[in-house]
Amino acid sequence: MKNQDQALIFEVSKEGRIGYSLPKLDVEEVKLEDVFESDYIRVEDAELPEVSELDIMRHYTALSNRNHGVDSGFYPLGSCTMKYNPKINESVARFAGFANIHPLQDEKTVQGAMELMYDLQEHLIEITGMDTVTLQPAAGAHGEWTGLMLIRAYHEANGDFNRTKVIVPDSAHGTNPASATVAGFETITVKSNENGLVDLEDLKRVVNEETAALMLTNPNTLGLFEENILEMAEIVHNAGGKLYYDGANLNAVLSQARPGDMGFDVVHLNLHKTFTGPHGGGGPGSGPVGVKADLIPYLPKPILEKTESGYHFNYDRPEAIGRVKPFYGNFGINVRAYTYIRSMGPDGLRAVTEYAVLNANYMMRRLAPFYDLPFDRHCKHEFVLSGRRQKKLGVRTLDIAKRLLDFGYHPPTIYFPLNVEECIMIEPTETESKETLDGFIDKMIQIAKEVEENPEVVQEAPHTTVIKRLDETMAARKTSFTLCKASSCTSLIRITKEELAEVGSFFVWRICPALTDSKLPTQNLAGAKKPGGR
């Protein structure tokens, strides 16, 4: 079968074909009817594919060959730090003492794992300049939300219930305003100046007695260091607010500068980015949060402590915001990050930043003659170009990204940050060689020349991939299915985008035929009996 003709797993299915022989039942058989109510039991068999083990292996091996990852090629996705993940991390994470333990074990039986967690916290405290760290948050945005909830708890404990606004720059990560909203804050945007930095005058204008915090990435998402950070911290602190550090770009200042020394009160880190946990396929991540002393009482419980008798979790924290994740963080990623930090050492981490910044500036200068450079100044770990010049010739940034696929490269981040027209954001990381950078640069230059000489080649790209382009018009208009979301309902409702926008995704149950008199068509996910009305 040709790769282009890859069948769906359901198309490979043949009735009666068996892929695995289950062993004899060696425990007492339990009937589902004795455990679940009838509403939750299928009345028909699930329509699952019937395939052999060989069918499965060939099918998913073929699909895996279509994937692109750091191990298979250059991955210059801006603001994502797609660096190589050393394989020693995987070896250590698979040690029996780490891989085979259970979070409900007695603390006395997992002292080695707890020691690793404690030491990792100490390393992160030193790296960030914070007073303590919690490893609980699962990833970056979860860390953001946790940090903002700590700030909220701090203000409320001090009687400042009117501090309901969080300020974010117009170049901020999209998760910043999203996390602020989920944490119960209103988001206020502060503008960037002509140099791509936060406009201090605009910051002074928006900061007031309602300000809970200012969220910043430093360097920012344009790859530029916020050189006025100390003055910004003073402005926010004088108004009674807190300064929050989004650690997405820590790779640019690792062992060179510390958020705590810049005036930040809260910081979250992305161990899966800066400290080489595998990412890009959905996780898992790890988003530890560090705080200054006045926020320690509100950290999620438990906190990990070291005493004369060993390591233990302290749950006696009356002012804590509660748990933010079951047990204590994504332990496997924490093991990988600890391994990386110990392998690199202080000098190695310092070199990480030096090479990341060098690689980004080298690429920026080589590409500047062929693409617009919105901010012509020294960058940090990443930089942004603009495809405005190419757009005037009828070629969009999206087309450029698609053309890169023909050469085996994962495209950079495009159309972000939002304050740069036709934005192309590139982050090479420190792990790429000059030869790799030159290969990518040469193709970017080739594409720029194609835009001028033969734009159709770029407009119609990609030409060599299995999948070409999505039908954007159809995708925008076509109806889709969404879950009912009622607690006892398994219906999948077919609904147009317009109908979904009118009702709201969390209130789809109001038009579910299983619960109302609505005439919208549905599919029942479980093939179960539909429950009665609410």
Curated annotation (Swiss-Prot):
Coiled-coil boundaries: none
Record family assignment: Belongs to the GcvP family. C-terminal subunit subfamily.
Organism: Bacillus cereus (strain ATCC 14579 / DSM 31 / CCUG 7414 / JCM 2152 / NBRC 15305 / NCIMB 9373 / NCTC 2599 / NRRL B-3711)
Functional description taken from the UniProt entry: The glycine cleavage system catalyzes the degradation of glycine. The P protein binds the alpha-amino group of glycine through its pyridoxal phosphate cofactor; CO(2) is released and the remaining methylamine moiety is then transferred to the lipoamide cofactor of the H protein.
Catalytic reaction list: N(6)-[(R)-lipoyl]-L-lysyl-[glycine-cleavage complex H protein] + glycine + H(+) = N(6)-[(R)-S(8)-aminomethyldihydrolipoyl]-L-lysyl-[glycine-cleavage complex H protein] + CO2
Root EC class: oxidoreductase
Domain of life of the native organism: Bacteria
This protein's name: Probable glycine dehydrogenase (decarboxylating) subunit 2
Keywords attached to this entry: Oxidoreductase, Pyridoxal phosphate
Cited Pfam families: GcvP2_C, GDC-P
InterPro entries: GcvPB, GDC-P_C, GDC-P_N, GDC_P, PyrdxlP-dep_Trfase, PyrdxlP-dep_Trfase_major, PyrdxlP-dep_Trfase_small
Keyword match Oxidoreductase: yes
Reported cofactor(s): pyridoxal 5'-phosphate
Gene Ontology biological process terms, A to Z: glycine decarboxylation via glycine cleavage system
Molecular function per GO: glycine binding; glycine dehydrogenase (decarboxylating) activity; pyridoxal phosphate binding
Complexes and interactors: The glycine cleavage system is composed of four proteins: P, T, L and H. In this organism, the P 'protein' is a heterodimer of two subunits.
EC number of this enzyme: 1.4.4.2
HAMAP family attached to this UniProt entry: GcvPB
Gene3D superfamilies from the UniProt entry: 6.20.440.10, Aspartate Aminotransferase, domain 1 (3.90.1150.10), Type I PLP-dependent aspartate aminotransferase-like (Major domain) (3.40.640.10)
Organism ancestry: Bacteria, Bacillati, Bacillota, Bacilli, Bacillales
